Amino acid sequence: HSYSSAASDVYKRQINNFDKLKNNVRIPFSDNNFQRLLMIASIGCCVGMSTPQVHIIPLCIDQGLSIITGGKILSIMLFCAVLSRIIFGYISDIIGPLKTLLIGSTLQMITLILFIPFNSITGLYIVSILFGLSQGGIVPSYALIVKKYLPNKDAAERIGLIIFFTIIGMSIGGWMSGKIYDYTNSYSLGFLNSILWNLINVMIIFYI
């Protein structure tokens, strides 16, 4: 019993020391305010992320392409997202998760802009590939940011809250773009709406 108690004390001291080391990485906010900023930012990036993923097939049909072509473009987009999730992991190890998130979100916003003018089959393939390569590492960066900048003792709760808000962003993003299309019969304003939400994310992460 004494050995297990001693081991537990050593473990707790190591955790406390690690938290102290993390506290040396200064952020100009309290832990809770930093958490709130990340939750708001996560909504912004995921509203932007959801529009191509939810609406790429209807967009293709709207441009006179077949549903099969739309499915192929979506599959390639998601495959590229898997690749970028791995690539951005390596990048995060080098430059840190905050900068990685800023780069990924900025690139995602640029590719969202490209969806508006490039609506041919070739253009949609190219832009969808670029979009997939830009967005795969965004959501995992939030977990790494929490682990790096916030206390370990409640990391799981904080990460769970952020992921919850990313899902909210994905949900309302796809819905808003569809609603805008219903009113305008065009996806251009839907993508513009996503770009503006994505810009909110970029501004928050840049501010942090």
Protein language model annotation of sequence segments:
Residues 31-86:
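Extracytoplasmic gate region of multi-pass secondary transporters
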Residues 179-197:
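A membrane-interface helix-boundary motif in multi-pass transporters
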